[in-house]
Amino acid sequence: DKYNLELLVVDTQAPHQLNDGQYAQRRATCEQAAKILGVANLRVTADGIAKADDPFQALKETLDALPDETMKKRVRHVVTEIERVRSFVRAFASGDIEAAGRLFNASHDSLAADYEVTVPELDVAVDVARKNGAYGARMTGGGFGGSIIALVDKGRSQEVAQKIADEFEKQGFHAPRALAAYAAKSASREA
């Protein structure tokens, strides 16, 4: 509430397609990459890259150690996503909403290009939200269907959601469902 924002959540009504093994395959690829890199998990790799004198060079060297392009893409997504989350927390805490939005956008773009877990409904919803005033928008969850979230000014969720619904109708997609989420104090017990 401090920044006068709301989080628009849009369920694209695109069914999750996690039962065909694609999500598990990505996870297995990342686990295999961690073994090749000699680490317990890719968070260890991300931490090392973040602490390097030249993180870009450290990322390049990490990716160069991997045997194929698909694995490189998956690892690039995971490692850069870990850093994006850290950067988002810093940007949001400091009130830099524009930077926080750019990080949302970069996250979705990486999920689409490197992790390859988006579907047309997710990409259209994100694109429409971005073009209609969202600071940033991204898919959420495991992908292959499901929902997006968009960071918008308070009072704009309904307008942005309607633009998404209009575009979904044009594209022949199922009508999406949307809700606005607001920051609030945590629950507590009154004495």
Question: Predicted regions: what is each one?
Answer:
Residues 1-136, 151-191:
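C-terminal nucleotide
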Residues 145-151:
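Short beta-strand->loop micro-motif that forms the acidic, two-metal-ion catalytic signature
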